[in-house]
Amino acid sequence: ADNMSLTGLSDEEAKEFHSIFMQSFLIFTAVAVVAHFLAWAWRPWIPGAEGYG
């Protein structure tokens, strides 16, 4: 176990994986935010003072 982590990845491989993971996560989150905004514009899921009227 010379200089290996629990995953078996080297430090460089772990950093590369992390950057790809974070980029993918941010893209997924951005798509989710846009989808929620569009769904809210189509049909808000929290009624206003007047209800769903």
From Swiss-Prot:
Gene3D superfamilies: 1.20.5.250. Signal peptide: none annotated. One of its GO terms (biological process) is photosynthesis, light reaction. One of its GO terms (cellular component) is plasma membrane light-harvesting complex. A bacteriochlorophyll binds at H18, H36. It is found in: Cell inner membrane. Belongs to the antenna complex beta subunit family. This is Light-harvesting protein B800/850/890 beta-1 chain. It comes from Halorhodospira halophila (strain DSM 244 / SL1) (Ectothiorhodospira halophila (strain DSM 244 / SL1)).
